[in-house]
């Protein structure tokens, strides 16, 4: 029996210890700092790359051997920080700490603030900063003055209690709730969202195949496809790129168009929780007709120049003696023909006909592909809502919660009060109330 009682007391002690720990502000701050540190690590170290990438970039022979090498990165999960069990556990414990703090501290404090407290003895006012004796004749006049300053008034005999700014005491609870909501939305996106990248030629259909990241509970929809109807680039007068556009249609399983939109950078297409972004582009081929015969599609390969400009090169004739190369630098309709020695022999316009090496060659058109990023994050609406509530509740939390007490004894009136912020403004308010009541 004694042993059972000891076990019960031990369990009770453990519960109280955990309650005090989780509701402790310092504990929450430590958790927040740990989350910030690991988030910084996740920002510095590239996430969700192939193992070969880390073996190349973070070799065992570098100067940070004891800390930052590919083995440690993969061992501790720094290559996918935000989906590791320990990071998600930190978020859960931090949320639990905020919830416990709200339940055990904030809500009781709010309930206590809503109770009416009346003082009967003027000596009780000595603990208040700015307490004073007021020269007036009626208690009702003081109550009226408090109402002019938006105080909620309660009277009991010869005592008055007033308060205002109760929302300022309520706001911290909503701040904690907003942070918990924010973390919930973030975790939901991590475990059930996904990201895909596709490079699609103009006129082609595509489905979600190249998934670059996904959560454990992600669902990759395959009940519809998409088609790139057209791709074009808008250039500045100096031939630099101003913007590139993709005309995209969403199709159901029967090929019926469900939605069509032209996307560009910062203007994505949204459909059933999916967001399709314009991210990149490429030139993959040029179509030519030789001697009015068959149409050939010449593949192009991109080459990065030392000045970071990109060109596309394709082989027009394979024979060594008559080998020619076609070079494009953009999609503005011009190209250049080079011989096997790398000499520029002809500048052409796409869509026109030329005689080259005794052959009539018509350069019909170029085929470009658009780089698309497709994302699904079901936590985004929750995150946006939580930010709205967080900003609103933080703003409201700056409202001062002020309490004022007035007592009459032997025809003398005493006033005093407390506030949780803006102490000087509160003392000035007390003086104004005193002057107003004395002048009536």
Swiss-Prot record:
It is a multi-pass membrane protein. It comes from Pyropia yezoensis (Susabi-nori). GO terms for cellular component: chloroplast thylakoid membrane. It is found in: Plastid, Chloroplast thylakoid membrane. InterPro entries: Cyt_c_bgen_Ccs1/CcsB/ResB, ResB-like_domain. This is Cytochrome c biogenesis protein Ccs1. Keywords: Chloroplast, Cytochrome c-type biogenesis, Membrane, Plastid, Thylakoid, Transmembrane, Transmembrane helix. May interact with CcsA. The chain crosses the membrane at residues 25-45, 84-104, 170-190.
């Amino acid at each position: 029996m004694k042993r059972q009682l000891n076990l019960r007391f031990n369990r009770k002690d453990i519960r109280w210890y955990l309650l005090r720990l989780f509701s402790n502000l310092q504990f929450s701050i430590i958790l927040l700092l740990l989350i910030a540190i690991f988030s910084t690590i996740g920002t510095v170290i590239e996430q969700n790359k192939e193992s070969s990438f880390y073996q190349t970039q973070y070799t065992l022979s570098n100067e940070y051997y004891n800390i930052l090498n590919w083995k440690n990165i993969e061992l501790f999960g720094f290559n996918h920080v935000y989906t590791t069990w320990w990071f998600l556990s930190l978020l859960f414990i931090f949320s639990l700490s905020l919830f416990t703090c709200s339940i055990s501290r904030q809500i009781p404090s709010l309930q206590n603030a809503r109770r009416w407290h009346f003082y009967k003895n003027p000596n009780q006012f000595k603990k208040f900063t700015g307490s004073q004796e007021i020269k007036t004749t009626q208690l009702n006049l003081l109550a009226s003055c408090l109402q002019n300053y938006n105080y909620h008034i309660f009277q009991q005999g010869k005592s008055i209690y007033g308060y205002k700014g109760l929302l300022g005491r309520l706001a911290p609870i909503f701040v904690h709730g907003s942070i918990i909501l924010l973390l919930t939305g973030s975790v939901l996106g991590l475990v059930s969202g996904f990201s895909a990248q596709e490079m699609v030629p103009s006129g082609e259909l595509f489905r979600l195949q190249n998934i670059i990241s996904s959560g454990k509970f992600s669902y990759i929809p395959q009940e519809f496809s998409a088609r790139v109807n057209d791709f074009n680039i808008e250039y500045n007068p100096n031939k630099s790129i101003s913007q590139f556009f993709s005309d995209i249609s969403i199709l159901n399983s029967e090929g019926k168009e469900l939605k069509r939109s032209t996307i560009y950078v910062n203007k994505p297409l949204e459909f059933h929780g999916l967001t399709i972004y314009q991210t990149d582009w490429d030139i993959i081929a040029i179509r030519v007709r030789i001697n009015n015969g068959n149409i050939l599609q010449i593949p192009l390969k991109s080459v990065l120049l030392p000045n970071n400009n990109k060109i596309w090169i394709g082989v027009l004739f394979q024979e060594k003696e008559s080998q020619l190369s076609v070079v494009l630098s953009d999609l503005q309709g011009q190209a250049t023909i080079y011989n096997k020695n790398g000499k520029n022999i002809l500048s052409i316009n796409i869509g026109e006909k030329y005689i080259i090496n005794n052959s009539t060659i018509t350069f019909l058109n170029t085929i470009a592909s658009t780089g698309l990023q497709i994302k699904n994050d079901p936590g985004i609406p929750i995150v946006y809502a939580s930010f709205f509530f967080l900003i609103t509740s933080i703003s409201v939390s700056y409202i001062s919660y002020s309490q004022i007490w007035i007592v009459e004894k032997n025809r003398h009136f005493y006033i005093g009060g407390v506030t949780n912020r803006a102490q000087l403004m509160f003392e000035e308010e007390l003086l104004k109330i005193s002057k107003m009541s004395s002048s009536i």
